[in-house]
Structures are given as structure tokens and as C-alpha cells.
Design a protein with these regions (language model features):
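Short amphipathic helical patch at the helix-1/turn junction of helix-turn-helix
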Residues: 1, 11-13, 41
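N-terminal "mature-chain" segments and other terminal, solvent-exposed stretches
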Residues: 32, 62, 67-69
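Recognition helix of helix-turn-helix/homeodomain-like DNA-binding domains
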Residues: 26-41
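Short basic helix-loop element that most often maps to the first helix and adjoining turn
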Residues: 5-21
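DNA major-groove recognition helix of helix-turn-helix/homeodomain DNA-binding modules
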Residues: 45-61
Length: 171
């Protein structure tokens, strides 16, 4: 689905009109309508303010994918996903346990240049399990934001400040 249609869906999920959104961001209602109906492409420099103006968790995933392509985490909403918070919590636990099991099976004592092709394939498998766990966790955060009315922007702002305070990041 196009990013314009994703913006329209996100705006509707949040109960925001085009007029209301246009008052929050530097875009006219008419331009928003053209972006949403694909008569115009959303300029890259407006994507951040539109996404933050709507503050819809699923839209953040779509914009991330649009900006980074293959190196992004998708929102887990497929046919086999139950988006109830309790179900998502169990999925996180399952995927995390799978990732830890794969990590435990690796030969951590060997330098990477000494690894066989089979061991490297095992590392790739572990990395895919880590991505599954990460995706399930990110999707749980999105579901919890929706369910409890939290701003995903505010959750991430607070988290990033806490990372800097704990010296996990440098900026």
C-alpha cells in the first residue's frame, strides 16, 4: 500500500481530520488530501512531521520501512498474529526464548575468522531469531500504545533520554 494511503488510514485510526492535522503541521488540508489520494508524493522532509503529528504506532513502522527499506522492523499484523496485549506478550516470550536458545548454541569462544561455514550459518539463524524477538517486542509496544492511549513518540523520547542517562548511547 502507498505511503499516502497509510497516512490516511493512520489518521482515521486516530480520529483526526485532514483539517485538524493541517493545523498541527506545515501542510495545507488540500495538500494532505493530494498526498492521501496519491495525486502527489509526500515530500521526504514532511514525513517526520506528518508521522509525529498523527502519532500512530503502525504509521511509524511504515515510515521506517519507507525510509530504510529492507533494514527496518515490520509491524506484526499477519494472519497468524493475535494483537491482544496478552497474546503479544506470550509471543514476545516465545520469540525471545527461541533467540536465546540459538545464541546459547553458538561457539562464542572461537574468534570469528576461525568459524566454519556451518557455524556462520548458525550465527545467521541466531540473528534471524533475534530479529523475530525484536519485531515481536516492537509490535507489543505499538499494541500497548494503542490499547492504553500512550503516545509512541513520548514513549521513545523518554526511553532515549534514559539510554543516554545510563550511558548506553552517546547522543
Amino acid at each position: 500500500m502507498s505511503i499516502g494511503k497509510e497516512v490516511a488510514m493512520a489518521r482515521k485510526r486516530k480520529g483526526i481530520t485532514q483539517e485538524q492535522l493541517s493545523l498541527e503541521i506545515p501542510v495545507s488540508r488540500e495538500s494532505l488530501a493530494k498526498y492521501e489520494t496519491e495525486k502527489r508524493r509526500i515530500p521526504k522532509d514532511l514525513r517526520k512531521c506528518i508521522t509525529e503529528g498523527i502519532d500512530d504506532p503502525q504509521l511509524f513502522f511504515k515510515m521506517w520501512s519507507e525510509a530504510a527499506g529492507h533494514v527496518s522492523i515490520p509491524f506484526f499484523n499477519g494472519e497468524y498474529i493475535d494483537l491482544h496485549p496478552t497474546s503479544m506478550r506470550y509471543m514476545v516470550q516465545h520469540e525471545t526464548n527461541e533467540a536465546l536458545k540459538q545464541l546459547d548454541a553458538l561457539s562464542w569462544f572461537k574468534p570469528s575468522q576461525a568459524w566454519s561455514e556451518h557455524e556462520k550459518e548458525s550465527m545467521k539463524k541466531a540473528m534471524h531469531e533475534i530479529l523475530d524477538a525484536t519485531g515481536s517486542m516492537m509490535s507489543l509496544i505499538a499494541v500497548l500504545c494503542d490499547q492504553y492511549g500512550f503516545s509512541m513518540t513520548d514513549i521513545f523520547k523518554y526511553w532515549k533520554v534514559s539510554l543516554r542517562a545510563r550511558k548506553y548511547t552517546d547522543g
